[in-house]
Amino acid sequence: MVRRLFRRTAVLFTFTMLLSGVSAVQAEQKPAAARPAPPAMSKEDMNAFLARPLIARIATVRANGSPQIVPMWFLYEDGVMYMSTRTYAAKVKHLQKNPRAAVVVDEMVAPTKNKVVTIEGTVEVLTTGVKETTTKIYHKYVGVEGSASPQAQQSINTPRVILKITPKKIETIDTTH
């Protein structure tokens, strides 16, 4: 419980800093020279990590400037992240006003062994190819059979848009070795 609360607080802090233009490194007290850089993933390892059915958290900026963080399913293809969401979701309104977003996908293997991919970028709200992309995302998380279920089909056929996140900056950490 405490670990989960700490993790959520750390994620919220990181997103708040990213969206406000202050990096987590700038927010720390230690000088950069005193901290070794955490080990990064190779591009191949990052692509394999993002191909797994993990949960992403996307942070958008509300009208009042505060962050909204939402867990989402995603698809990462050819260096671009795609998410499917309902047409009238709050995050869509936020992104139409301010297309900047931050996304994190992470996995805690053990208390000191983590894999993290953080993406900062701009988001386009797409209204074409929605059903096809949403179906691909569902295949990733519940398989072809699960995607054909009545519940999945109802969700897939709900009015939706695709969030196309084009990364401006990608950072990775892999402390599992």
Summary of predicted features, one role per range:
Residues 50-51, 96-97, 156-157:
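Alpha-helix boundary recognition
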Residues 74, 119-123, 165-167:
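A structural signal for short, well-ordered beta-strand segments
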Residues 30-37, 88-140, 144:
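Short, structured beta-strand-loop surface elements
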Residues 2-5, 11, 15, 24-37, ...:
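C-terminal edge-of-domain segments
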Residues 54-86, 95, 103-105, 118:
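Short beta-strand segments
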Residues 31-60:
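Short, conserved active-site entrance elements at the starts or edges of catalytic domains
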